[in-house]
Amino acid sequence: MNLNLKFAALSVLASLLSACGGSNGFPPVVTGVKVQSAQYGKMATIYLGGKDLRSNLLIDTSGACTNPTFASNSNTDTLVLNCVVAKTGDFSLVVQTAEGAAIYSTTLNIPLPQVALITAEGSITVELDPTLAPISTNNFLSYVNKGFYRDTLFHRVIPNFVVQGGGYTTGMVKKTEQSAPIELESNKGLSNLRGSLAMARTNLPNSATSEFFINLVNNVSLDYKNAANPGYAVFGKVVQGMDVVDAIAAEPTGVVGGFSDVPLADITLSLALQSK
């Protein structure tokens, strides 16, 4: 999945080269790189500052940045690259001439994605694992970033087991417009321990959509055993606000709209926001 961004290979660069004045015989010099809004799964902007920068430079991000496009405000002093962040952790960014000579290199860092779940009871911050559970992580972030979880409920609360949310609104009305079900990622080495975040599903393994749950205790019985007992896919963990989760778990529950274990007073997820 290595990405070699060959600037000259992108059709948009022909116009950029013209706008930048083309090659003037001076060697390009990169004096610094600045990255703006670098969050996993989102569009990042990379500013390459220097002198005599040309659009036939090569940039290698080792697959960390995909779908590259150049902003129209690029010039010979600043090349502005937009791309989608596809990896986390440290990665090298190397700028090369068209002949392959390295003229600048630096190491950039993309943090693990985090999402803030905002409720009246308080905020819960979950950290996701796109390395071991990329399908579940990308699915969850897709729902988060399109605002799907706004005003949904923690609709299933079972003390000493789980709190579950992400699929219903007030009155236990099922929310529509879910994306297609995703492939189960339960056999990836992540366990349903206290505080872990996992995808809820039906009895069919590959049926998870928007609903998720947080484990209140070590529920290793929910882990993958074999193909006949595939378990539930963990894709993250609570890193802040487990006390809020425990407070939700202490709320009285009953039967609402034919559903059991429903909090008698709505516990509303007012907003889910990607914070990193």
Residue ranges with predicted function:
Residues M1-S18:
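Sec-dependent bacterial lipoprotein signal peptides
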